[in-house]
Amino acid sequence: MISRIPHIPHTFIEFGVESYREANTRLLLKLRNWRGLVIDGSADYIQRIQSQDIYWRHFLTAECAYIDRNNINAIIQSAGFDGEVGLLSIDIDGNDYWVWEAIDVVNPAIVVVEYNAVFGDVQSIAIPYNPEFQRLNAHYSGLYFGASIVALIE
């Protein structure tokens, strides 16, 4: 996909990365030498990322923050990112829709957002915004989170 977009910036922002071992942007960093920002709410995960060779060998910034729609722009800007970016990846198992809607400090060429397939592909559904949202606290199954694909397309 990135090869089909002319003059795509070689920068990315990804949040909800956990240890960054299974991330949407990892190959862009390693194989294409993109510069990026990764964010996770767990200090342990961020410490793991910062101790990996991928962190010091590449242009990677790793920030520990619990993201909500009120702080996401400040987090992105304080890490030195604004304007055009190549890819934005959102996977926070909860307020993904609301956080994406709030982002206005970057303009990504490509956006990857986790959607909830349980909500189906017919109706526009998003969980109500709750800055304290925890997927497993919301419902024991862990299946109540995020938004339907229709909501994200709209």
What is each of the regions a protein language model found here?
Residues 1-78, 83, 87-90:
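SAM cofactor-binding core of SAM-dependent methyltransferases
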Residues 27, 34-35, 83-90, 94-154:
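Conserved acidic-Pro-Pro-aromatic motif
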